[in-house]
C-alpha cells in the first residue's frame, strides 16, 4: 500500500524536480515561475541571493497535501491510489490543502532578513501580504467586503482537517466569512517563506476524498473562488 512521506507520493508515478521559468524583476521583487509536482514545489529552496522574490507555482499533478501537524492517519492512501492523486506533506500549516492543475493560484513570497516586510511576529509579517492580496482581489471586483484577519489562528468547523476551513494570520475573508486567501509561513534566520493561495475552483468533494469524509453544506460554501481572473500582477504591484 502506498505510504505518505514529506517528498513521496501515493505511488502514482515518478517524481520530478520543479522546473523554473526565466526570472524577471517587477518593482523590487524578482518573479520566478515554477512548475512541478506538489512535493517538489513544497521543498524549502530559498533564492540564491537575499532578494525579495515572488514564486508563482504551478502544480503539474493533483495532490492532497497534509499540514505539518496533521496526523498521517487522516489520509487514506488507497483512495488516493484509486483517484490517481498524490498524498504529500508540507512543513507548514495545519489542515490539508487540495491541489489540482489549473485549480488554484499558488504564490510563494520570500522575504529576506532585514527587508522592510520582515517582522519577527508571525501575524505582523503576514498582515501586509494579506493586504496586498486583498487589494489585488478588490481591483478585479472579486469578493464582497474583503478583509484581512490580523489575529491568530482561529478554529472553525472542519479546520483540523481542511486548511481553507480555518482562519490564520493575514488571511483574506469576505463579509460572509468565506476564505479567499490562505497563508502559511516557514522561517529561518535568513528567510520568511509565505505560502499563499487562492482557488480558481473550490471542489469540496475532491478536497475531502483522500480524507475519507463527505463535505457538508458549510464546507461547500466556505471558500471563495476567482475563476479565470489573474490576480498575480496586482498582487506584485501591491507588495
Which residues fall in each region the model found?
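A glycine-rich, hydrophobic loop/mini-helix early in the fold
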Residues: 77-121
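Short histidine-centered catalytic/ligand-binding loop motif
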Residues: 109-126, 219-229
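Active-site loop/lid in soluble adenylation, ligation, and acyl-transfer enzymes
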Residues: 2, 19-82, 86-90, 96, ...
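Cationic, low-complexity basic patches in intrinsically disordered or flexible, solvent-exposed regions
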Residues: 16
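Long, positively charged amphipathic alpha-helical accessory segments at protein N-termini or as interdomain linkers
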Residues: 130-158, 186-239
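Aromatic/basic-lined ligand-recognition segments
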Residues: 162-173, 177-185
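Residue-identity detector for glycine
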Residues: 8-13, 21
Amino acid at each position: 500500500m502506498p505510504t505518505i512521506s514529506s517528498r513521496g507520493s501515493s505511488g502514482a508515478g515518478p517524481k520530478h524536480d520543479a522546473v523554473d521559468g526565466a526570472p524577471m524583476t517587477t518593482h523590487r521583487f524578482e518573479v520566478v515561475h515554477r512548475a512541478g509536482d506538489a512535493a517538489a514545489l513544497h521543498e524549502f529552496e530559498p533564492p540564491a541571493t537575499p532578494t525579495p522574490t515572488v514564486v508563482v507555482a504551478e502544480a503539474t499533478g493533483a495532490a492532497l497535501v497534509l499540514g505539518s501537524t496533521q496526523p498521517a492517519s487522516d489520509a487514506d492512501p488507497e483512495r488516493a491510489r484509486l483517484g490517481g492523486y498524490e498524498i504529500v506533506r508540507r512543513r507548514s500549516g495545519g489542515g490539508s490543502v487540495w491541489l489540482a492543475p489549473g485549480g488554484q493560484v499558488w504564490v510563494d513570497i520570500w522575504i529576506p532578513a532585514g527587508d522592510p516586510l520582515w517582522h519577527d511576529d508571525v501575524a505582523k509579517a503576514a498582515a501586509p501580504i494579506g493586504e496586498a492580496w486583498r487589494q489585488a482581489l478588490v481591483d478585479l471586483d472579486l469578493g464582497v467586503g474583503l478583509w484581512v484577519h490580523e489575529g491568530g489562528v482561529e478554529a472553525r468547523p472542519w479546520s483540523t482537517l481542511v486548511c481553507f476551513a480555518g482562519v490564520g494570520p493575514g488571511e483574506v475573508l469576505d463579509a460572509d466569512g468565506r476564505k479567499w486567501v490562505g497563508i502559511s509561513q516557514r522561517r529561518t534566520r535568513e528567510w520568511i517563506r509565505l505560502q499563499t493561495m487562492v482557488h480558481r475552483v473550490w471542489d469540496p468533494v475532491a478536497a475531502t476524498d483522500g480524507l475519507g469524509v463527505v463535505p457538508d453544506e458549510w464546507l461547500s460554501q466556505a471558500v471563495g473562488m476567482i475563476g479565470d481572473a489573474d490576480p498575480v500582477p496586482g498582487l506584485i504591484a501591491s507588495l
